[in-house]
């Protein structure tokens, strides 16, 4: 039985932290995933502490830092880190097999600019990331909670938008993607109303998939099912 923090919000977008106990059915680690965690965690793993990271110490350099919330199995995150060696990348994922897979792929790819948390993303963002320190925050294909009674569980809410804004540098970007059209409309409504942001779309809607975001398995699945994919990018201006 695992204690897992789940995000829940009231009708005004106020973040309500709730602790729910449930069995985390994430599957067993493969041998390769377990070996990757054992061998790569000392180098790429970040142990959670409620103290802001010193990014220059963590990465051994000064560089723009990109943070991804919920990287799944990590394939696209590793690809981004490989494609942009001049940037630092931090990924957060609660599912251990995903962490193991990401570390395995990162080791094979030889990336040195990636660090990983196996922890609740809200706690990391709130306490372990310094204000004004990030060049980009990425949230790709979050759970859409498509039933109306579950909409309050969606992570993109007014208070979350403000939390992300506080962690971005001026000029930093909050980049979201979803294959659920109604959720994209919800994201757009929340973000267009969020103070201190500017929509990077020319018509204040969505943007084409930028080159820096690789196609993911979720996106491929959406295409197979005849779904579209919507990218939203909002720049912190204040």
UniProtKB/Swiss-Prot annotation:
Enzyme Commission no: 2.1.1.33
Xref: Pfam families: Methyltransf_4
Residues involved in S-adenosyl-L-methionine binding: 68, 93, 120, 143
Catalytic activity reported: guanosine(46) in tRNA + S-adenosyl-L-methionine = N(7)-methylguanosine(46) in tRNA + S-adenosyl-L-homocysteine
Domain of life the protein comes from: Bacteria
Keyword S-adenosyl-L-methionine: yes
Pathway the protein contributes to: tRNA modification; N(7)-methylguanine-tRNA biosynthesis
InterPro entries, A to Z: SAM-dependent_MTases_sf, tRNA_(Gua-N-7)_MeTrfase_Trmb, tRNA_methyltr_TrmB_bact
GO cellular component terms given for this protein: tRNA methyltransferase complex
GO molecular function: tRNA (guanine(46)-N7)-methyltransferase activity
Keywords: Methyltransferase, S-adenosyl-L-methionine, Transferase, tRNA processing
Catalytic residues (positions): 143
Recorded family membership: Belongs to the class I-like SAM-binding methyltransferase superfamily. TrmB family.
Cited function: Catalyzes the formation of N(7)-methylguanine at position 46 (m7G46) in tRNA.
UniProt-recorded name of the protein: tRNA (guanine-N(7)-)-methyltransferase
Organism field: Shewanella sp. (strain W3-18-1)
Encoding gene, per UniProt annotation: trmB
């Amino acid at each position: 039985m695992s204690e897992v923090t789940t995000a829940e919000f009231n009708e005004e977008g106020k973040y309500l932290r709730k602790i729910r106990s449930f069995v985390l059915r994430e599957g067993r680690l493969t041998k390769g995933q377990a070996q990757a965690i054992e061998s790569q965690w000392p180098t790429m793993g970040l142990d959670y502490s409620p103290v802001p990271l010193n990014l220059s110490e963590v990465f051994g350099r000064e560089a723009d830092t990109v943070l991804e919330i919920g990287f799944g199995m990590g394939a696209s995150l590793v690809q981004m880190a490989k494609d942009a060696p001049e940037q630092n990348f931090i990924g957060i994922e609660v599912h251990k097999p995903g962490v193991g897979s990401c570390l395995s792929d990162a080791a094979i790819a030889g990336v040195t600019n990636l660090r990983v948390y196996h922890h609740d993303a809200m706690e990391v963002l709130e306490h372990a990331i310094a204000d004004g320190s990030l060049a980009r925050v990425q949230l790709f294909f979050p759970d859409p909670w498509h039933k109306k009674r579950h909409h309050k569980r969606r992570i993109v809410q007014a208070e979350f938008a403000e939390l992300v804004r506080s962690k971005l540098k001026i000029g930093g970007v909050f980049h979201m993607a979803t294959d659920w059209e109604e959720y994209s409309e919800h994201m757009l409504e929340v973000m267009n109303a969020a103070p201190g942001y500017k929509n990077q779309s020319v018509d204040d809607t969505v943007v084409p998939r930028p080159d820096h975001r690789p196609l993911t398995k979720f996106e491929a699945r959406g295409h197979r099912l005849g779904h579209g994919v919507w990218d939203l990018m909002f720049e912190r201006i204040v």
